[in-house]
Design a protein with these regions (language model features):
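Nudix hydrolase/Nudix homology domain
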Residues: 1-175, 230-234, 297-336
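N-terminal strand-loop-strand
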Residues: 75-78, 176, 190-236, 240, ...
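Short functional micro-motifs and their immediate structural scaffolds
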Residues: 183-186, 204
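Active-site proximal loops enriched in glycine and acidic residues that flank catalytic Cys/His/Asp
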Residues: 225-226, 238, 267-272, 288, ...
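The catalytic Nudix box helix
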Residues: 235-270, 284
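Active-site-adjacent beta-strand/loop module that shapes the phosphate/pyrophosphate-binding cleft
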Residues: 272-295
Length: 336
């Protein structure tokens, strides 16, 4: 019985950051281009996004490449050190990945499916039997971690790309047959789409739009914590966009539902792909309108409170749009 896994591969010779002296992810808001494809770098607060190259054509995994395997919602890493990779943030841990040659030597009949490319880095998914998966685990000395571990992993330049691999793997895994006529779907040769060769039905990757909301009250920011979720650190009000609803309307509704507050002066900040939950996130800042008395929806949140700039934690992981927005407010870098 085969199970679906994903492999990310990259060229070792080019290293993690460089491609012909071009940075895949640079620093302080620099923007680079390569093959008419823009790649945004880390901005001042460390948040990174990328425009992934979706050139849908035949690609082959080959020697000199390295990367992680994904299997049933978990990631195979060759090294997951208990020692922090960043002494300023004890939650960040260094990981590395097995080489393509090692995997190929142990599983020569594995079939790879191309996902996407980031300059010298190609992402593939691969079908492995359970026995092969356990064998790979043994010979590489690796271990499996879940996708949420990636929020505290390093190096950051591949974390969001790996999470995009999770996103696509889940989409492929859930869409084998046409929902209209039940025939098997095939990959399109031109765009990122699965097509039914019988009835012509087209299936695109599922992307769920959601908002992240920074509600301000003078020099205070509304911070929350989720109820019943794995992530236990500070967050902002957040929620999914509903059918027939503008994103600004989503902002008003989610803030009211979760905290009982009314808001005004809604301002767009920026967006971020978030493959952890198959989202595209849109960040907004707004101001409390009227009373600032909070009525917490305990089904969604375990707490919500106003926090002054001086009280906001400084050691936030740098991956998420949420933490960037919290840091931007703490450093008073926006129009608040």
């Amino acid at each position: 019985m085969e199970v679906t896994s994903v492999v990310m591969v990259r060229s070792e010779a080019l290293g993690f950051l460089a491609y012909k002296k071009r940075r895949i992810f640079g620093c302080s808001g620099t923007v680079y281009t390569h093959e008419k494809r823009k790649i945004e770098a880390y901005n001042d607060s460390g948040h990174c996004t990328t425009y992934v190259g979706h050139n849908i054509q035949k690609h082959t995994a080959g020697p000199g490449q390295q990367g992680p395997f994904f299997s049933r919602g978990q990631l195979l890493v060759q090294q997951a050190s208990d020692k922090p990779a960043d002494e300023s943030n004890q939650d960040i841990h260094q990981i590395s990945f097995p080489r393509y040659e090692d995997i190929k030597a142990e599983c020569p009949d594995a079939k790879y499916q191309y996902l996407f490319t980031l300059d010298d880095t190609a992402f593939f998914r691969v079908a492995l039997s359970h026995a092969d998966k356990m064998h790979i685990l043994e010979v590489t000395g690796g271990k499996f971690i879940n996708r949420h571990y990636m929020r505290s992993a390093s190096p950051k330049e591949y974390v969001l790309a790996a999470i995009t691999g999770f996103h696509l793997d889940g989409w492929y895994d859930k869409n084998h047959f046409c929902g209209r006529c039940a025939n098997r779907l095939v990959e399109d040769d031109v765009e990122r789409m699965l097509r039914c060769p019988v009835c012509g039905n087209m299936v695109y990757p599922r992307i769920n739009p959601a908002v992240i909301v920074g509600v301000t009250n003078g020099d205070k920011l509304l911070l929350t914590k989720y109820n019943g979720r794995e992530y236990k650190k500070y967050a902002l009000v957040a929620g999914f966009n509903e059918i027939g609803e503008s994103l600004e309307e989503t902002v008003r509704r989610e803030v009211m539902e979760e905290t009982g507050l009314r808001v005004k002066n809604i301002r767009y900040y920026k967006s971020q792909p978030w493959g952890f939950t198959d989202n595209i996130l849109a960040g907004y800042f707004c101001e409390v309108d009227g009373t600032d008395e909070i009525e917490v929806d305990m089904q969604e949140l375990s707490m919500a409170k106003w926090v002054s700039r001086e009280e906001i934690p400084t050691s936030l992981e740098e991956l998420s749009l949420t933490n960037e927005m919290i840091s931007v407010f703490r450093l008073d870098k926006g129009d608040f």
